[in-house]
């Protein structure tokens, strides 16, 4: 319950910031274009706080925190007095209306650059993307990837840490091939470029990582069988496991690596497992019944809410991504461009069917991401805000009526035919666009629930 509440609070904060940025873009440009703004609202529904500013605009925070809006004076929906006609949105020139509508997404992109700029100036801990394990006969093994190699680039884009590697791999979902530039972990010798055949790459984001589906895992420090965390009210606590216990046997088999424990728990949802642990020099036998979690396609795995002791990272594998003021700005622009490219690429692949609808995420996934990154720290939360802000900006530019991109599409048509698109056509477009948007939202929310 505590995690759910924390995720909800972080989600509300994140959404409030991003919606405020987006709507402020519309508001600010509208005011600069001479349009009267009647209301600026964060959220929908009944207002829980509001005030009228000196400019005559009503500023409001509403009960439903799933968006916001800017209400401008508009002759299409209100009777506008003759003396205020020049301040109505619909009376503005085509370029002014286009500027007002496009300002929301543009401000989202600018905010992302600002957030990444802060991230790179503050600095974020990172580890070198060194390969730890390669599964025999996997796609990675066939391409010649080996343990100890450091991934320098994915398809020519530098990858200083695992986050950038993961972004690069995800960007190739649905492609036939990609290249990975590698070197030894010590940096000795020349870099090698490996071509990865992706035709047999079956990647389900609900069950594994992109690199796991390719057949390799990151290097991780030694993981012992000693428990350092037992979640309250979890299956491990109910079984009597305690922090400090060392797992010796699972179902009578000696435990040589922690992965054996993970495999046993995941393969026994709601089924008893005999566990022997060492506690204060004594051997203790327990019965663990893992809880169950349903993944995609009805697959059910077990989980117990326990975590092992992990050794410290070697010093030569750790570093901090931190730069000066001006270099951070350049890095922020570069990072934002990479995220934009990845998001646009994924949208295209979604449209043509190269990427399945099960990759869509909704508000529950966003809330979990907000809570997790906020728990890690301010700089991680900032990075999350930048990522979601870019996605929000791009989604709003999709040419579907009801979105900013739909309005811009109507304006483009108006520029060609030299008259506004007929109201009936716009109304039909809004209905079709609304149906598509709500259908995609339903799929995204369904995906969220399958991942719980």
UniProtKB/Swiss-Prot annotation:
Which stretches make up the PDZ domain? 197-292
What membrane topology was assigned to this protein in its record?
A: Multi-pass membrane protein
**One Pfam entry name:** Peptidase_M50
The record lists the membrane-crossing segments as 98-120, 378-400, 428-447
Q: What is its main location?
A: membrane
Task: Give its E.C. classification number.
Answer: 3.4.24.-
Q: Which positions are catalytic residues?
A: 23
Record's keyword annotation contains Acetylation:
no
| Positions annotated to bind Zn(2+) | 22, 26
Tell me the protein family, please: Belongs to the peptidase M50B family.
In Swiss-Prot or TrEMBL terms, this protein is called: Putative zinc metalloprotease VC_2253
Species: Vibrio cholerae serotype O1 (strain ATCC 39315 / El Tor Inaba N16961)
């Amino acid at each position: 319950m505590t995690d759910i509440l924390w995720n909800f609070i972080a989600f509300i904060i994140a959404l409030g910031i991003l919606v405020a940025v987006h709507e402020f873009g519309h508001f600010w440009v509208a005011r600069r274009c001479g349009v009267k703004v009647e209301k600026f609202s964060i959220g929908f529904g009944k207002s829980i706080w509001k005030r009228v500013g000196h400019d005559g605009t009503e500023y409001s925070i509403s009960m439903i925190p799933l968006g916001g809006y800017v209400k401008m004076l508009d002759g299409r929906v209100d009777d506008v007095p003759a003396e205020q006609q020049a301040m109505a949105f619909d009376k503005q020139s085509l370029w002014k209306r286009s500027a007002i509508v496009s300002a929301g997404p543009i401000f989202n992109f600018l905010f992302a650059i600002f957030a990444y700029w802060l991230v790179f100036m503050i600095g974020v801990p990172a580890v070198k993307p060194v390969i730890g394990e390669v599964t025999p006969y996997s796609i990675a093994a066939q391409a010649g990837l080996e343990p100890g190699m450091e991934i320098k680039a994915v398809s020519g884009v530098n990858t200083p840490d695992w986050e950038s590697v993961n972004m690069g791999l995800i960007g190739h979902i649905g492609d036939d091939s990609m290249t990975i530039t590698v070197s030894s972990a010590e940096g000795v010798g020349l870099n090698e470029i490996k071509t990865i055949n992706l035709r047999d790459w079956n990647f389900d984001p609900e069950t594994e990582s992109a690199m796991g589906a390719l057949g390799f895992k990151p290097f991780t420090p030694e993981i012992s069988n000693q428990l350092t965390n037992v979640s309250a009210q979890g299956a491990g606590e109910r079984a009597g496991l305690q922090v400090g216990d060392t797992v010796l046997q699972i179902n009578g088999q000696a435990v040589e690596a922690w992965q054996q424990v993970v495999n046993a728990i995941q393969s026994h949802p709601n089924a008893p497992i005999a566990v022997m642990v060492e506690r204060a020099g004594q051997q203790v036998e327990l019965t663990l019944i893992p809880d169950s979690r349903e993944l995609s396609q009805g697959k059910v795995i077990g989980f117990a809410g326990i975590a092992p002791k992990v050794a410290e990272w070697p010093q030569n594998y750790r570093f901090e991504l931190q730069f000066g003021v001006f270099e951070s700005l350049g890095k922020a622009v570069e990072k934002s461009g990479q995220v934009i490219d990845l998001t646009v690429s994924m949208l295209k692949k979604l449209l043509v069917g190269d990427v399945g609808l099960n990759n869509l995420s909704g508000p529950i996934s966003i809330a979990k991401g907000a809570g997790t990154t906020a728990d890690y720290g301010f700089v991680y939360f900032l990075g999350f805000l930048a990522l979601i802000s870019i996605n929000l900006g791009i989604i709003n530019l999709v040419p579907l009526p009801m979105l900013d991109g739909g309005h811009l599409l109507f304006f483009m048509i108006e520029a060609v035919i030299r008259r506004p698109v007929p109201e009936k056509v716009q109304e039909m477009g809004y209905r079709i666009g609304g149906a598509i948007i709500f259908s995609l939202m339903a799929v995204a929310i369904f995906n969220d629930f399958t991942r719980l």
